[in-house]
Swiss-Prot record:
GO biological process, any: urea metabolic process
Family (UniProt): Belongs to the UreE family.
UniProt GO MF annotations: nickel cation binding; unfolded protein binding
InterPro entries according to UniProt: UreE (IPR012406), UreE_C_dom (IPR007864), UreE_N (IPR004029), UreE_N_sf (IPR036118)
Pfam families attached to this UniProt entry: UreE_C, UreE_N
Cited SMART domains: UreE_N
Record's function text: Involved in urease metallocenter assembly. Binds nickel. Probably functions as a nickel donor during metallocenter assembly.
Protein name: Urease accessory protein UreE
Highest taxon in the source lineage: Bacteria
GO cellular component: cytoplasm
Length: 172
């Protein structure tokens, strides 16, 4: 299994790509399958959120580019800036991850939120699109706390298997 352990800022070339949903891009430990079918695992520093175009690397320099997967989202639109701001305010007040662009915003589909925004006067469309929420005011990490990132220690255990093929017990 390919073990992706580093987040890079730039590289001369990419060796593979992986398509991940927004929820998958919040995980630091996750088994994944690259677009070419190779098994891989994320063993990344905690607290980082991956974005479309993020670059990951193994310890030996194999580079993987992250592609934001299309997923079911709701897109709310309004030509009225005040109405649009109110809709974004109410979503933010509910701590909804939100992608904000000129005249529209996008969030993971939730019919209750859709109805709330329609009630405010926004137009809401359910779509299958890539979702790239705002990183937040603190620089794109989770701010040092978890939002349900279930820890998968099987990947960490796998990272302790060395070249001679058997696992060791390591104290942490």
């Amino acid at each position: 299994m390919i073990k992706l352990t580093q987040i890079l800022t730039e590289v001369p070339s990419v060796d593979a790509k992986v398509c991940l949903t927004m929820v998958q891009r919040t995980k630091s430990r996750l088994r994944i399958v690259l677009e070419d079918g190779q098994d891989a695992g994320l063993l990344l520093p905690r607290g980082h959120i991956l974005h479309h175009g993020s670059l990951l690397s193994t310890d030996d320099g194999f580079v993987v580019e992250v592609v934001a997967a299309k997923e079911q989202v709701s897109t709310a639109r309004s030509d009225n800036p005040t109405l649009f701001a109110k809709g974004c305010y109410h979503l933010g007040n509910r701590h909804v991850p939100l992608q904000v662009e000129a005249g529209w915003c996008r969030y993971q589909h939730d019919y209750v939120l859709d109805e709330m925004l329609i009630g405010l006067g926004l137009q809401v469309t359910v779509e299958n699109e890539a979702f790239q929420p705002e990183a937040g005011a603190y620089g794109g990490t989770t701010g040092g706390h978890s939002h349900g990132d279930a820890y998968d220690d099987s990947l960490e255990k796998a990272s302790h298997e060395h070249a001679h093929g058997h696992p060791h017990k390591h104290e942490h």
